[in-house]
Amino acid sequence: MAINITVITTANRARRFVQADGAAIEPIVDSLNRSSQLFAGKPLIIGSAAHTEVFSTASVACVEFETDGDLSDHMASPMNLVLTALSPQELTVPFEGVIEGEHFKVRIDFFFTGGYVLHTRAEGVRKAVLAERLMNLTSFLERPVMNYRLPQGGIGLMNPHAISRFLLTPGVADLPRDAWLAEPA
């Protein structure tokens, strides 16, 4: 099993790394179990015999781990939803989301400071209590890390502290009391 690692910065730059040695992959995959600490302030260091690269985690939007191996055991399921990054093909087709009954399927576009945009599909079970649904909506930006699946296989880790805003389609009917009601111009 090989693993491709992509570090996407808030400046909308992507640095790619590859590792095919199973012994070197194991500690990388094991570190996913501590993913909630990834953006806690300590630098992200990726090194090889040729060079060592150090990233300020405050400037990292996402880190993606592309592989044909199953990484789902290392992926905590936040809230009651599964996020999946949209493929380039999915971005060309109009999105048909639904929020009905106990289930929902929405598109969430995450906009990061500096210009990077991550387009995702979110699917899950709606919380029965309004207060829990509102907490899900507002707690995105308060989490230490958010996980998402890659369409080509693998997982990504999103830095919520680098998100400037996110857009849900279709819109959410259950808004907080202090939300402003207005249409986009």
Predicted regions and their residues:
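A short, sequence-level motif marking secondary-structure junctions
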Residues: 19-25, 57-63, 122-128, 160-165
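Structured core of small recognition/catalytic domains
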Residues: 109-185
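A cross-kingdom feature marking solvent-exposed beta-strand/loop segments within repeated
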Residues: 15-55, 127-132, 142, 147-155, ...
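Generic marker of residues within folded, mature protein domains
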Residues: 36, 98-100, 138
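Intrinsic disorder/low-complexity detector
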Residues: 1-15, 42, 49-52, 57-119, ...
